[in-house]
Swiss-Prot record:
Protein name: UDP-N-acetylmuramate--L-alanine ligase
Binding site for ATP: G128, T129, H130, G131, K132, T133, T134
Gene label: murC
GO molecular function terms attached to this record: ATP binding; UDP-N-acetylmuramate-L-alanine ligase activity
Keywords annotated in UniProt: ATP-binding, Cell cycle, Cell division, Cell shape, Cell wall biogenesis/degradation, Cytoplasm, Ligase, Nucleotide-binding, Peptidoglycan synthesis
Job of this protein: Cell wall formation.
UniProt cross-references to NCBIfam families, sorted A to Z: murC (TIGR01082)
Localization annotation: Cytoplasm
Family: Belongs to the MurCDEF family.
InterPro entries, A to Z: Mur-like_cat_sf (IPR036565), Mur_ligase_C (IPR004101), Mur_ligase_C_dom_sf (IPR036615), Mur_ligase_cen (IPR013221), Mur_ligase_N (IPR000713), MurCDEF_pg_biosynth (IPR050061), UDP-N-AcMur_Ala_ligase_MurC (IPR005758)
Organism expressing this protein natively: Shewanella violacea (strain JCM 10179 / CIP 106290 / LMG 19151 / DSS12)
Catalytic reaction annotation: UDP-N-acetyl-alpha-D-muramate + L-alanine + ATP = UDP-N-acetyl-alpha-D-muramoyl-L-alanine + ADP + phosphate + H(+)
Annotated GO CC locations: cytoplasm
Length: 483
């Protein structure tokens, strides 16, 4: 074990009982959140193995770190392990979970293991319906710029680090807090961020929005009395919750009553410029290397966290200006030459109507002269059903729309909540005539006829559409890379 690993194996240092844990097994190890925690643990010196249904970039990276990866779930693969980590996406009848219980091997949720990593560190937990990955990445980048050398666990690839997780040589742990299954209630951070609260993952909350809101309050009350809640006052639901939070609160937003306020927002292509206003100090000019008002809010959250920790403005401003982005968050994949001219290709993970609307707005602001062509893959039948009218309205705002089949994420189809239904409803609005395609082959043959010179082509969604964007970027359409 390297000196850094030995020095910062804090689970063993602070919890002597963790010394009896030598081999940790992850079921569903290829997920971004699961893989991130696995990477931190293997760098702390634990033996790691795990399984998933297919290889991906996460499993390939973990293999390079010495993690044993199994493709497919089989009962014998958990034999000899000391603890099994699982996400709530894994079915209770999974043979590895069944075997672990029969063998009396402890089974813990992903968030429980993250909570153990955070227990003896200065934890910063970022929660909210949208913006978690970007905000967490910005905070981690600022702390790295300030030589705080944080440990971080992020739900997307931080381009500057080449990974979504890293074991740092300090007391700081910066991580996303997942409300989708209410597992963020396991966390006990020193700083909690709430970016916004909207109806999503409502099956977890029995369709009760009030229960979702009260769960966020419970999350904030996991802070110690000396902790800090950083909250976006621009979000109406977050603003409503402020009087109910019995902890120190720092607010941020464009609103005049925000503690950390942005003024004079201007977007220039990919970058966003604004004036930062805080009580008791001079205004300063800030540029964040991300497009859109929503990303200014994410930057304000990171500034609020850093300011509370007395990080110098110089490090904050430099980190935001030099930010290299996150995989699949308005990720520019290049400009390509087609038979009809040049096309700019952007890939984005957003899959909630508000996220898609923010992406469209950023594209319009940064590239107002470009025709916006979107390939959208709905994510989950339940989300499409619950937010159907919002999707119809938002998707009608592009110039050309191509709809792929719903990425089910394991859900059974819901009648009337599929892409063909969306196509019909959008067409009935009369703003544009969407195109439904049943598969990748049909799409790839269609695109050369659809695209025009100067287009901005946006691949949008949380399913496997990211693979499709790479297919396009790898010249499968006969494109020639220009930049």
């Amino acid at each position: 074990m390297s000196k850094s690993k030995e020095k910062y194996s804090q689970l063993r240092s602070f919890i002597p009982e963790m010394r009896r844990v030598k081999h940790i097994y992850f079921v569903g190890i290829g997920g971004a959140g699961m893989g991130g925690i696995a990477e931190v643990l293997v760098n702390e010196g634990y033996r790691l193995s795990g399984s998933d249904i297919a290889e991906n970039a996460v499993t390939e990276r973990l293999k390079s770190l010495g993690v044993q990866i199994h493709i497919g779930h089989h009962a014998d693969q958990v034999h000899g392990t000391d603890v099994v980590v699982v996400s709530t996406a894994i079915d209770a009848e999974n043979p590895e979970l069944v075997a672990a219980k029969e063998l009396r091997i402890p089974v813990v949720q992903r968030a429980e293991m993250l909570a153990e990593l955070m227990r003896y560190r200065h934890g910063v937990a970022v929660a909210g319906t949208h913006g978690k990955t970007t905000t967490t990445s910005l905070i981690a980048s600022i702390y790295a710029q300030a030589d705080r050398d944080p440990t971080f666990v992020i739900g997307g690839l931080l381009n500057s680090a080449g990974t979504n997780a890293r074991l740092g040589n300090s007391r700081y742990l910066i991580a996303e807090a997942d409300e989708s299954d209410a597992s963020f209630l396991h966390l006990q951070p020193m700083v909690s961020v709430v970016t916004n609260i909207e109806a999503d993952h409502m099956d977890t909350y029995g369709g009760d929005f009030e229960k979702l809101k009260s769960t966020f309050i419970d999350f904030l009350h996991n802070l110690p009395f000396y902790g800090v809640a950083v909250m976006c006052i621009d979000d109406p639901v977050v603003r409503e919750l402020l009087p109910k939070v019995g902890r120190k609160i720092v607010t941020y937003g464009f609103s005049e009553d925000a503690d950390i306020q942005a003024l004079n927002f201007v977007q220039q292509g990919y970058s966003s410029h604004f004036t930062l206003r805080r009580d008791g100090v001079e205004d300063i000019a800030v540029m964040v290397n991300l497009p859109g008002e929503h990303n200014v809010l994410n930057a304000l959250a990171s500034i609020a966290v850093a300011t509370e920790d007395e990080i110098e403005d110089e490090a904050i401003v430099l980190a935001l200006a030099q930010f290299e982005g996150i995989g699949r968050r308005f990720q520019q994949l290049g400009t390509f030459a087609t038979s009809k001219g040049e096309v700019m290709l952007v890939d984005d993970y957003g899959h909630h109507p508000s996220e898609v609307a923010a992406t469209i707005k950023a594209a319009r602001l940064g590239w107002p002269d470009k025709r916006l062509v979107m390939i959208y893959q709905p994510h989950r039948y339940s989300r499409t059903r619950d937010l159907y009218d919002d999707f119809v309205e938002v998707l009608s705002q592009v110039d050309c729309l191509i709809l792929l089949d719903v990425y089910s994420a394991g859900e059974a189809p819901v009648p009337g909540a599929d892409s063909r239904a969306l196509c019909r409803s959008i067409r009935q609005r009369g703003q544009l005539d969407p195109i439904f395609v049943a598969g990748t082959e049909q799409l790839l043959s269609l695109l050369p006829d659809v695209l025009q010179d100067g287009d901005l082509l946006l691949t949008q969604g949380a399913g496997n559409i990211g693979t499709l964007s790479k297919l396009i970027a790898q010249t499968n359409l006969g494109f020639e890379v220009v930049s």
